[in-house]
Design a protein with these regions (language model features):
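Membrane-proximal extracellular/periplasmic loop immediately following the first transmembrane helix
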Residues: 1-12
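Juxtamembrane "pre-transmembrane" interface segments
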Residues: 160-168
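Short active-site oxyanion
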Residues: 23-25, 166
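Conserved beta-strand segments of alpha/beta enzyme cores
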Residues: 3-4, 41, 167
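Acidic pyrophosphate-coordinating catalytic loop
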Residues: 14-20
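Residues that act as N-cap/strand-start positions at coil-to-secondary-structure junctions
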Residues: 10, 21, 75-76
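Mid-to-C-terminal secondary-structure elements
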Residues: 16, 26-28, 32-48, 52, ...
């Protein structure tokens, strides 16, 4: 019934720095399959991949507003390093698209890290802010919402009657 399920973690109020340029941003930790939830429209470089996840690579993609503020002269920044919250990340991709979703930060305002890298860099442990799900054709989310909620609660030892832990 479920086609894609992928976690999302984020942090607001960060600053990305490249040389003497700064950009306020959100930092998102995503899995490669997030692209199946929301197309990233990478125009330079690439998106986060499985090797980045497995090796906890310090790489990132940057959104349109972050790119415009850090690289006002334009050009391809892939291979360059920017600093966010005291940690250097190599830019591997740029998304010049605007986001359809603005939950936990839109693409254009974000520096996106591999999910596992963000977990370690910010000491998030097993924290997940958002779980994004798509369902197979012909299935509605409302038809399986209760089942999804039960699975999440069971997997994370949340009491079945707790109405605040999981919001659908």
């Amino acid at each position: 019934e479920v086609e894609v399920i992928t976690p999302n973690i984020s942090r607001w109020g960060s600053t990305a720095i490249f040389g003497d340029k700064k950009s306020s941003c959100a930092v998102r930790g995503l899995q490669p399959d997030y692209e199946k939830i929301e197309a990233q429209n990478i125009t330079m470089g690439r998106f986060i991949n499985d090797v980045d996840i497995l090796e906890n690579r310090k790489v990132c993609t940057i959104g349109k507003r972050v790119y415009d503020e850090l690289f006002p002269q334009g050009g391809n920044p892939c291979g360059q390093y920017l600093r966010v919250d005291g940690i250097y990340y190599q830019i591997v991709g740029v998304s010049l698209s605007t986001s359809n979703m603005n939950i936990n930060a839109g693409t254009e305002d974000s520096v996106t890290l591999p999910f596992t890298t963000m977990q370690k860099a910010y000491n998030f442990g097993k924290r997940i802010d958002l779980v994004c799900i798509t369902v197979k054709p012909g299935v509605t989310v409302t038809s399986i919402a209760d089942k999804i909620e039960q699975v999440i609660k069971k997997a994370h030892y949340i009491h079945p009657d707790d109405k605040q832990a999981v919001i659908m």
